[in-house]
Curated annotation (Swiss-Prot):
One of its GO terms (cellular component) is HslUV protease complex. It comes from Prosthecochloris aestuarii (strain DSM 271 / SK 413). NCBIfam families: clpX, PRK05342.1. One of its GO terms (molecular function) is zinc ion binding. This is ATP-dependent Clp protease ATP-binding subunit ClpX. Keywords: ATP-binding, Chaperone, Metal-binding, Nucleotide-binding, Zinc. InterPro entries: AAA+_ATPase, ATP-dep_Clp_protease_ClpX, ATPase_AAA_core, Clp_ATPase_C, Clp_protease_ATP-bd_su_ClpX, ClpX_bact, P-loop_NTPase, Znf_CppX_C4. GO terms for biological process: cell division; proteolysis involved in protein catabolic process. Component of the ClpX-ClpP complex. Forms a hexameric ring that, in the presence of ATP, binds to fourteen ClpP subunits assembled into a disk-like structure with a central cavity, resembling the structure of eukaryotic proteasomes.
């Protein structure tokens, strides 16, 4: 039985190259001086040169590489300057300059913080920037939700809205706080990298305020209990989330979501907060006039701007919860002028939306100025801010939009004051006709 001939010492089988006397093509060290030597077609490189090359490349890449969505392992939101963020918000939200500026700075710093975590490698030189969640305080219909929604669209990050009134402590009827993260995952198509850079807007946050200043023997599962449950999520923690929502149960596969870089924006009307602030402001004036001054302070439309963390604590938010919402911004009530501007000025103004719908049917929609003023007057009386504008217009336009698709030759529809008051019909113009007809 013949045996295969062993290669000569120092030579690889099937090769005439001698590997006992090789040297590194970069540093000149021989194979005896290093641990490993990698051979190429016409060159050699030792393990020391490989390690040096890796270190050089790592430093160069960390210095010049910018994060982008194309990076498979590093999704980064679109970073925009605070000034541009504020201007972009102003295209959709009328007024509220102070709130827009505060949001712009807070959001910019938040995503700058994420960027610094990704690219700063030297822990000794790294200053840890703490997370800054946001609390929006303002009457209903002033644009809190719209501000958060517009921010998410502007930055191209996943966004979800959660109603705080549906949340309860674990083990009670209602939604666990983890369902917040489930909805964000769903909004990101279960892309975990995107979800962990998203924005969550928690609406009606004032409704989970402690029901009483005194500790009760009965558990407040939808108030203080929810605040306690939200603490770790707001601050930043790895949370196991059921992918399809619902309650956790044994043997269920969970998705671990790190909330460290998720921006939480909490909003609420905080009815009655102005009275607390007014009483505090009036305490500085003791005597017979203190009660009058308290009433005057409560009536001040800018009283919410004087809110402090102590006021929020007295309202019913626990100190730990307040501490995790360091950026507090207030929104002003909407007056008639602001409502009038909301109707026509923003990119997605209500009047523009209805005009677009009519344009799809080949009809131009026109509102008389006094008709718009009347819409504002009715909405102002309802006291629900900008939400009332849509309700008023929808009631007026529903019959017109029902009939329009069945009408032929209509080129223009004019809404008059009489149409708004209900004692007149809209005026229609038709093709090849100078006459105007009412519906």
């Amino acid at each position: 039985m013949s045996r295969e001939k062993e290669p000569e010492k120092g030579k690889r089988k099937g090769s005439g190259r001698d590997y006992t006397k090789v040297v590194c093509s970069f540093c000149g060290r021989s194979s005896d001086e290093v641990s490993n030597m990698v051979a190429g077609p016409d060159a050699f490189i030792c393990d020391r040169c490989i390690m040096s090359s890796v270190e050089i490349l790592r430093k160069e890449i960390s210095a010049i590489k910018q994060p982008s969505k194309e990076d498979g392992d590093s999704f980064q939101p679109r970073l925009i300057s605070p000034k541009n963020i504020m201007e972009s918000l102003g295209q959709y939200v009328v007024g509220q300059e102070r709130a827009r500026k505060s949001l712009a700075v807070a959001v910019y710093n938040h995503y700058r913080r994420i960027e610094s975590q990704e690219w700063v490698r030297d822990a000794e030189d790294d200053v840890v920037i703490e997370k800054s969640n946001i609390l929006l305080i303002g009457p209903t219909g002033t644009g809190k939700t719209l501000l958060a929604q517009t921010l998410a669209n502007l930055l191209d990050v996943p966004f979800t809205i959660v109603d705080a009134t549906s949340l309860t402590e674990a083990g009670y009827v209602g939604d666990d706080v983890e369902t917040i993260l489930t909805r964000l995952l769903q909004a990101s198509d279960f892309n975990l990298e995107r979800a962990e850079r998203g924005i969550i807007y928690v609406d009606e946050i004032d409704k989970i305020a402690r029901k009483s200043a005194n500790v009760s023997i009965t558990r407040d599962v939808s108030g203080e209990g929810v605040q306690q449950a939200l603490l770790k999520i707001l601050e930043g923690a790895v949370v196991g989330v059921p992918p399809r929502g619902g309650r956790k149960h044994p043997e269920q596969q969970l998705i671990n979501v790190n909330t460290r870089n998720i921006l939480f924006i909490c909003g609420g009307a905080f009815e009655g907060l102005s009275k607390l602030i007014g009483r505090r402001v009036a305490k500085a004036s003791m005597g017979f006039g203190s009660k009058v001054k308290a009433q005057q302070a409560e009536a001040d439309p800018e009283i919410l701007q004087k809110v402090t963390q102590d006021d929020l604590h007295e309202y019913g938010l626990i100190p730990e919860f307040i501490g995790r919402l360091p950026v507090i911004s207030t929104l002003d009530p909407l007056d008639a002028k602001a409502l009038r501007n909301i109707l026509v000025e923003p990119k997605n103004a209500l009047v523009k939306q209805y005009q677009k719908l009519f344009e799809m049917d080949g009809c131009e929609l026109v509102f008389d100025e006094d008709a718009l003023d009347k819409v504002v007057e009715i909405a102002l009386d309802r006291g629900t801010g900008a939400r009332a504008l849509r309700s008023v217009l929808e009631n007026i336009m529903i019959d017109i939009m029902f009939e329009l698709p069945s009408m032929t030759g209509v080129t223009k529809c004019r809404i008059t004051l009489g149409t708004i008051n209900g004692d007149g019909l809209p005026e229609f113009s038709f093709e090849d006709s100078d006459t105007k007809k009412t519906a």
